[in-house]
């Protein structure tokens, strides 16, 4: 069996393969964060195409989300998310719980304890909607991502300095304590911002350990931060940094990085760089990518024998 299509245990959940739909920002939600038929249809297409795990687009944990952003900040939104879960069935869904980024001046003094409760309540709603688990979003352009970064977090209280990941860990711990062991709790973290004043790999090694100790049984590792995110020049360009985190933790790790080629994805998994591969553009362009990837692996193109050039094949000028 190809590793890309082998099952994997994520705590209490076993997924059928290693293909994950990267959380898209579809902008298809209605005002107030409600789902729409177009939103449900997109998840239904990805599930039918054969992905092993679906990550929702970011779901706001607090009221008044940005226009087009889905939400999970109120009990009335449980039924909305349940429509997405039903559309994707039987493919498991993880709800990506997110707090949008805050203005930098506000970030330095805003109270953070209420945000922990907002995440925990949103996680409860996700489970009530039928989700297999949640992903706590610490990616760039999020409040938790800001707090984890030294370039944006200059707080001098218990959430600054060496404790920049405290809120993210407190959120994971609160969800685990409240909802118990039968829920997948993932944590998304920026492993390196690729800039001198940003998050570094050495810091992220510590953060990864802290998140797992708090109760995370899945890590979603991303590299770079807006607006310094480099343009990917080759498949799997993020994998060396992802592998550095995977070697330190005992939970599965998701990798991103323009991995739209099935053979390259299979090779990365076999090398141990990651446990799951997240796809964004390939699935947006072709929801049936998993099916075609399996066909590609089963029927690799024939090797072409190299022909040694002879003098007669060279241009006459030579």
Predicted features along the sequence, with ranges:
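Flavin-dependent oxidoreductase catalytic cores
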Residues: 1-318
């Amino acid at each position: 069996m190809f590793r890309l299509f082998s099952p994997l245990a994520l705590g209490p959940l076993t997924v059928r393969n290693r293909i994950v739909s990267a959380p898209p920002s579809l902008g298809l939600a209605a005002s107030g964060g409600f789902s729409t038929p177009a939103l449900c249809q997109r998840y239904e297409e990805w599930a039918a195409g054969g992905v092993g795990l679906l990550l929702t687009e970011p779901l706001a944990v607090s009221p008044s989300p940005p226009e087009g952003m889905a939400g999970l900040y109120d009990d009335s939104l449980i039924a909305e998310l349940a429509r997405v879960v039903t559309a994707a069935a039987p493919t498991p869904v993880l709800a990506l719980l997110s707090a949008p980024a805050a203005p930098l001046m506000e970030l330095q003094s805003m109270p953070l304890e209420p945000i922990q409760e907002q995440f925990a309540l949103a996680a409860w709603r996700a489970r009530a909607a039928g989700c297999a688990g949640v992903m706590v979003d610490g990616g760039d352009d999020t409040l938790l991502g800001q707090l984890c970064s030294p370039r944006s977090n200059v707080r001098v209280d218990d959430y600054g300095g060496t404790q920049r990941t405290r809120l993210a860990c407190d959120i994971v711990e609160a969800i685990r304590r409240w909802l118990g062991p039968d829920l997948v709790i993932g944590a998304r973290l920026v492993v390196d911002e690729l800039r001198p004043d940003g998050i570094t790999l050495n810091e992220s090694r510590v953060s990864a350990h802290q998140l797992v100790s708090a109760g995370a049984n899945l890590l979603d590792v991303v590299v770079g931060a807006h607006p310094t995110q480099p343009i990917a020049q080759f498949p799997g360009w993020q994998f060396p940094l992802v592998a550095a985190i995977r070697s330190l933790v005992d939970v599965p790790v998701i990798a991103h990085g323009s991995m739209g080629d099935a053979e390259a994805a299979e090779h990365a998994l076999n090398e141990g760089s990651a446990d799951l591969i997240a796809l964004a553009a390939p699935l947006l362009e072709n929801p049936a990518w998993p099916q075609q990837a399996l066909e590609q692996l089963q029927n690799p193109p024939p090797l072409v024998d190299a022909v040694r050039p002879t003098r007669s094949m060279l241009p006459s000028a030579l």
